[in-house]
Amino acid sequence: MTNQKKFKRQETQIWQHLQWEPSPQQLEQFNQLQYLLREWNQKINLTRLIEGNDFWISQILDSLWPIQDELKFQDKQINIIDVGTGCGLPGLAVAIALPRSSTTLIDSIYRKTSAVKEIVKELGLLSRVNVLTERIELTGQKKLHRHTFDLAIARAVAKAPVLAEYLIPFLKPTGQAVMYKGKWNDLEKKELLKALSKLKGKIDTTKSLELPERRGIRHAIRISSTMLCPGKYPRSVGIPLKRPLNNQTSDNL
Ligand SMILES: C[S@@+](CC[C@H](N)C(=O)[O-])C[C@H]1O[C@@H](n2cnc3c(N)ncnc32)[C@H](O)[C@@H]1O
């Protein structure tokens, strides 16, 4: 089998996993994203997962499987935020897959966000994808962004209690946050629940997927608010990480 045919078969497998298939324009945008990441990676170190199935499985499938629920409603206009976006993922893959959504991507590292801004421009997504260079703790306290998102997502940014403090304040009362996790166990769940009790949040669902090609197991933890998140969260820059909310004495500012 030629490499091209073999790859076509693997690509089809990815969409089968998602029970969703991109339109020709979306597929073109995913291909363009791969090309642009490759180009930018030569200038600054953005990600090592760019070629072949490193990109299609470990980036695209890994970004999209946790939002399978949203993929079923392509026409819904939703407001999404990706915190700690790094090279632009999972946010850019989600923005391409949900063409009526508006997405905000945040990272505090300027060299990453300036590359991601250029990528957004090249992909033709400027009208509905906004890139911010900022600490999540500051964005989460701004009226413009607080309680304004239907979906808040984060992959590989921090441990669950820290992530919950970053994500919950962004949610509308009906919104949900999705934490993309590699490993997940009862201890982590217990720690997350402790943090959520302070943030007035709850766990809605926990899903898992074994990525193809033995790329490991992934978990998606969906959380939401039970009532409005107390105004003191997220705490000042660096505090959520230094004193995570699962720790009894952590709540002193
Ligand atoms: C390991 S990278 C993950 C990037 C991307 N989400 C992915 O899955 O490939 C974590 C990113 O989160 C950003 N980050 C972590 N804590 C942050 C904070 N408090 N405010 C803004 N960005 C943060 C870092 O700058 C880094 O780019």
Curated annotation (Swiss-Prot):
Its EC number is 2.1.1.-. Coiled coil: none annotated. Pfam families: GidB. Signal peptide: none annotated. SUPFAM superfamilies: S-adenosyl-L-methionine-dependent methyltransferases. GO terms for molecular function: rRNA (guanine-N7-)-methyltransferase activity. Keywords: Cytoplasm, Methyltransferase, rRNA processing, S-adenosyl-L-methionine, Transferase. It is an enzyme of class 2 (transferase). Gene3D superfamilies: Vaccinia Virus protein VP39. It is found in: Cytoplasm. Its main location: cytoplasm. Specifically methylates the N7 position of a guanine in 16S rRNA. This is Ribosomal RNA small subunit methyltransferase G. The gene is rsmG.
